[in-house]
């Protein structure tokens, strides 16, 4: 049997836990207004990791930095956080790792800077992952 881990996702938009349909903001449903409560639910149900996406940052419209920092403080040493969305610089990567994020998921930044990513992978070791969003035949 192959071992695998499920990472429940928390997509943050304006501090709320949301779900987008086909990645469109206009097709958004808020399913929890307290991300701490949502992550506590995942922790109570045995999950070891949570995947958080900052949709505000991903869409280039502010960010959920304060909310994410509160999550990191609330769950330090309890659950690992994997973070993606709007991370577009080495400074962003360093900031979030230094703040306690266990793994950074890079998307567009990685594709636009492949040589830099090769160097970063040496520096940050197992702290980076590559995220691909596919739509029909487009990445």
Predicted regions and their residues:
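Structural preference for beta-strand elements that scaffold enzyme active sites
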Residues: 5-9, 49, 78-82, 103-105, ...
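Conserved, mostly hydrophobic/aromatic
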Residues: 11, 42, 50, 96, ...
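Alpha-helix-loop-beta-strand connector modules within alpha/beta enzyme cores
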Residues: 61-82, 119-132
């Amino acid at each position: 049997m192959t071992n695998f881990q499920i990472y429940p996702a928390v997509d943050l938009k304006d501090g709320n836990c949301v779900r987008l349909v086909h990645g469109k903001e206009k097709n958004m449903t808020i399913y929890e207004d307290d991300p701490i409560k949502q992550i506590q639910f995942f922790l109570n149900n045995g999950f070891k990791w949570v995947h958080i996406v900052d949709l505000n940052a991903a869409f280039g419209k502010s960010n959920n930095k304060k909310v994410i920092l509160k999550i990191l403080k609330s769950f330090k040493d309890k659950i690992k956080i994997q973070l993606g969305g709007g991370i577009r610089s080495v400074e962003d990567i360093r900031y979030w790792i230094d703040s306690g994020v266990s793994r950074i998921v890079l998307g567009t930044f990685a594709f636009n800077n492949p040589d830099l990513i090769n160097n970063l992978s040496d520096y940050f070791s197992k702290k980076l992952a590559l995220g691909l969003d596919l739509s029909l035949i487009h990445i």
